[in-house]
Amino acid sequence: MALAVLRLALLLLAVTFAGPLFRRFSKYKTPFCARYQLPGCPRDFNPVCGTDMITYPNECTLCMKIRESGQNIKILRRGPC
């Protein structure tokens, strides 16, 4: 009986501390467009995958697309889609 209570307590602790980690990593990242002076982006290749499932060469080009289209595109992940 004591072993079952101990297992339950450990499970509750694990869920309590792991929950915020999963929520933090499951959210999409908002691009920080204020750092770029648009129009005109650097030519560095650091691809990002937008929530519109388009791969952008870098975060600046994603910001340019947001500015032109008015869409609320977030960064799904770093790297190609």
From Swiss-Prot:
GO terms for molecular function: serine-type endopeptidase inhibitor activity. It holds the Pfam family Kazal_1. Keywords: Cytoplasmic vesicle, Disulfide bond, Protease inhibitor, Secreted, Serine protease inhibitor, Signal. Residues 1-21 form the signal peptide. Disulfide bonds join 33-63, 41-60, 49-81. It comes from the Eukaryota. Gene3D superfamilies: 3.30.60.30. The keyword Transcription regulation does not apply. The record marks 43-44 as: Reactive bond. InterPro entries: Kazal_dom, Kazal_dom_sf, SPINK2. More abundant in epididymis than in testis. One of its GO terms (biological process) is spermatid development. It is found in: Secreted; Cytoplasmic vesicle, Secretory vesicle, Acrosome. SUPFAM superfamilies: Kazal-type serine protease inhibitors (SSF100895). One of its GO terms (cellular component) is extracellular region. Residues 27-81 form the Kazal-like domain. Strong inhibitor of acrosin in male and/or female genital tract. Also inhibits trypsin. As a strong inhibitor of acrosin, it is required for normal spermiogenesis. It probably hinders premature activation of proacrosin and other proteases, thus preventing the cascade of events leading to spermiogenesis defects. May be involved in the regulation of serine protease-dependent germ cell apoptosis. It also inhibits trypsin. This is Serine protease inhibitor Kazal-type 2. The lineage of its organism: Eukaryota, Metazoa, Chordata, Craniata, Vertebrata. The gene is SPINK2.
